[in-house]
């Protein structure tokens, strides 16, 4: 049994106006499902069920069993459009998962070993919190682990430094883009008002 499931219904009332009515009157989230050998489907889901699913970070990079009017299909989240102020989901895109066929997905990054550079007086900055990967459905990782324990002040972790799980390829690297993932820098020194006043008086 899939740990991540979502119920949906087909919708025929399309367009921006229809989507707004769904959200306002029925507390539904409009979405589209595409990919595989089937035609795209416009669907709607209960907003509260979508919110509950997304409470688990793993749902963003996990195969979801989508039940559309009694017909089940495996999908992954491709894109989410959120309200700019409130943060709730306004629209979702799902891509069908086909066994034996590679997919691309956005996977969260988990950083470990941050205590070591901090003890050396550094501060760790996360340049990115997620990565796009390409793999077969069976190899889709829940997250990508990045170890920063060996970093010194001034060091940077690039995507090429990160070990990809077996069967997984980083899309950015495949396109020649060696992204910065994290860096360690010296803490910024902020002078307080008394110090600045004393320096001003000395001048």
UniProtKB/Swiss-Prot annotation:
GO molecular function terms attached to this record: 5S rRNA binding; structural constituent of ribosome
Annotated InterPro entries: Rbsml_bL25/Gln-tRNA_synth_N (IPR020056), Ribosomal_bL25/Gln-tRNA_synth (IPR011035), Ribosomal_bL25_b-dom (IPR020057), Ribosomal_bL25_C (IPR037121), Ribosomal_bL25_long (IPR001021), Ribosomal_L25_dom (IPR029751), Ribosomal_uL5_bac-type (IPR020930)
Gene Ontology process terms (BP): translation
Keywords recorded for this protein, A-Z: Ribonucleoprotein, Ribosomal protein, RNA-binding, rRNA-binding
GO cellular component: cytosolic large ribosomal subunit
Description of how the protein assembles with itself and partners: Part of the 50S ribosomal subunit; part of the 5S rRNA/L5/L18/L25 subcomplex. Contacts the 5S rRNA. Binds to the 5S rRNA independently of L5 and L18.
Functional note: This is one of the proteins that binds to the 5S RNA in the ribosome where it forms part of the central protuberance.
Protein family: Belongs to the bacterial ribosomal protein bL25 family. CTC subfamily.
Protein name per Swiss-Prot or TrEMBL: Large ribosomal subunit protein bL25
Organism, as annotated: Pseudomonas syringae pv. tomato (strain ATCC BAA-871 / DC3000)
Gene assigned in the entry: rplY
């Amino acid at each position: 049994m899939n740990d991540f499931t979502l119920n949906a219904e087909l919708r025929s009332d399309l367009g921006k106006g229809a989507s707004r009515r769904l959200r306002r009157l029925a507390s539904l989230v409009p979405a589209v499902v595409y990919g595989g050998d089937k035609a795209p489907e416009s669907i709607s889901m209960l907003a509260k069920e979508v919110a509950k699913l997304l409470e688990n970070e793993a749902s963003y990079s996990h195969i979801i069993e989508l039940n559309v009017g009694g017909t089940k299909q495996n999908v992954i989240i491709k894109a989410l459009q959120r309200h700019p102020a409130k943060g709730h989901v306004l629209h979702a895109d799902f891509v069908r998962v086909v066994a034996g066929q590679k997919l691309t997905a956005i996977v969260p990054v988990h950083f470990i070993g941050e205590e070591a550079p901090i003890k050396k007086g550094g501060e760790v900055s996360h340049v990115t919190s997620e990565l796009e990967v390409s793999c077969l459905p069976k190899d889709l990782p829940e997250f990508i682990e990045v170890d920063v324990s060996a970093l010194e002040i001034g060091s940077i972790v690039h995507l090429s430094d990160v070990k990809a799980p077996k069967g997984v390829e980083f899309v950015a690297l495949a396109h020649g883009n060696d992204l910065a993932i994290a860096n360690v820098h010296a803490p910024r020194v902020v002078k307080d008002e008394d110090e600045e006043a004393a320096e001003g008086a000395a001048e």
